[in-house]
Amino acid sequence: MTNRNVIKNVLISVSDTSNIIEFSKSLISKNIKLFATKGTANFLKKNNIYATDITNYTNFPEIMNGRIKTLHHKIYASILAQPKHDKKTIEKYNIILMDIVVINFYPFEEASNNTNLHLNDIIEHIDIGGPAIVRAAAKNYKNVLVVTQPNLYQSIVNEMNLNNNIISETTKLKFATIAFKHTMNYDNNIYQYLSKKNKTVPKNTQLQTLLPSHLTINFKKKQDLCYGENKQQQASWYTNTSKNTSGRMKIKQLQGKILSYNNLSDIHLALSCIHEFNKTTCAIIKHGNPCGVATAKNNDQAYKLAYETDPISAFGGIIVFNQKLNDVTARKIIKTQFSEIILAPDFTQEAKKIFDKKPNLRIIKYDPNYNYLNYNIDIKSIYGDILVQSNTNSIININQWDIVSKKRPNEQEINDAKFALRVVKHLKSNSIVLIKNQITISIGSGQTSRIDATKIAIYKANNNNISLNHTTLASDAFFPFSDSIDLISKSGITCIVQPGGSIRDNEIIMSANKYNISMIFTKQRYFKH
């Protein structure tokens, strides 16, 4: 019986042929014999590499148009055999022991993303034999090295060079772990796709579908980040590979320093906020909060008005537009303030040339046709567990509103109320936003009491010498006491929009009537923590 620790035979069956030519040549140079499924053997042959067709070993052909290639007991015996215990069986049936199994699967994920393929075609991309062989090899890791990723090939060659064609048990266990994770992710992608396609789920089970009893979400590392929220924290960016989730940041960095954890967090908020508006709009984001949002005739004016909401807070912020950015606005930004990031659906060549002079400034182009509000769930980690909730970006429906005051809001106040809600829903609680003519006049956010948020919003407006006459105020949650209404009455604010729901709602409404302020109940709270 030969020493199974020394690599003698390798089985290869790959859909992704990346690096396989170089790897195969390295194996052959070490006098290692290659076995391969028909397609892989033909690919290697075209590149002047000989591999024995696995059917010559099994004496059984591939059948059913290739659906059955490796589902044969002789192949599994080659992989699952334990020489010390199975010596007689190995000799009796002339079993060739496979020391390395190199397998990757049919590209199901790629097929499932192809909108031109029918369900029946996509089903054909579900690999059966590949995952089965990988699991078998991983189970017998003490005797077999299983390799599922092309980027691992060179590390195997390096170890064999150092150890006379022997792979350590430590490496085998490591690769077996990677293999089981690979099969898990593969099966989960299939499950997520078929779940999405399943039309038999009753409408009343929407909650169970969104928040099932067992939740499996796969993430793949996209890139390491320089650090987390603070320099002492490590951080990476992972993308969600599960097919039942639609939230993705479709962005392209055109210039500037590498994106940080805080940058990406604020970009997420910036895209969510700007996607609320159809008309030309600019928003400025700072530390997880909008600090200025304005709609205007053009980018130049929208930026000016958004910036004037809070020039101090805008310093070092992220600026986002929903229209193509030209050189006029680019010059104004550079002249006006320091910014970490500028986002827009596109930039003119003249604007790019202006930003080129600021090489550290991050310029981000995003896909304007993607719905950045259309992600299914929010996830928060709590000591190893997670909290999961459906996202809060519900459509603002004025048909659900109740005008609870004697004074009715006019058309401008209704429009400003809608605008205000599109901003306040993205602010950290407790939050108050003041709006006039679809421009943020002032913002008070992240306070532990509603009256403090109200005081800050009014103070900032007064400090900037901005009149609050005919201004609309939006609150992310109800007013628990009438003290905020008393304060608001002295400012010139004429309309309040809030969800309602306090046990003191009647008292709050009476105060609004007392001060001749119109009040709208939306029945929709927007807490954000």
From Swiss-Prot:
It comes from the Bacteria. Keywords: Hydrolase, Multifunctional enzyme, Purine biosynthesis, Transferase. Its EC number is 2.1.2.3, 3.5.4.10. The keyword Translocase does not apply. Coiled coil: none annotated. Residues 1-148 form the MGS-like domain. The keyword Transferase applies. PROSITE patterns: MGS. InterPro entries: AICAR_Tfase_dup_dom_sf (IPR024051), Cytidine_deaminase-like (IPR016193), MGS-like_dom (IPR011607), MGS-like_dom_sf (IPR036914), PurH-like (IPR002695). It catalyses: (6R)-10-formyltetrahydrofolate + 5-amino-1-(5-phospho-beta-D-ribosyl)imidazole-4-carboxamide = 5-formamido-1-(5-phospho-D-ribosyl)imidazole-4-carboxamide + (6S)-5,6,7,8-tetrahydrofolate; IMP + H2O = 5-formamido-1-(5-phospho-D-ribosyl)imidazole-4-carboxamide. GO terms for cellular component: cytosol. Pathway: Purine metabolism; IMP biosynthesis via de novo pathway; 5-formamido-1-(5-phospho-D-ribosyl)imidazole-4-carboxamide from 5-amino-1-(5-phospho-D-ribosyl)imidazole-4-carboxamide (10-formyl THF route): step 1/1; Purine metabolism; IMP biosynthesis via de novo pathway; IMP from 5-formamido-1-(5-phospho-D-ribosyl)imidazole-4-carboxamide: step 1/1. Belongs to the PurH family. The IMP cyclohydrolase activity resides in the N-terminal region. PANTHER family: BIFUNCTIONAL PURINE BIOSYNTHESIS PROTEIN ATIC, BIFUNCTIONAL PURINE BIOSYNTHESIS PROTEIN PURH. NCBIfam families: PRK00881.1, purH. This is Bifunctional purine biosynthesis protein PurH. It comes from Buchnera aphidicola subsp. Baizongia pistaciae (strain Bp).
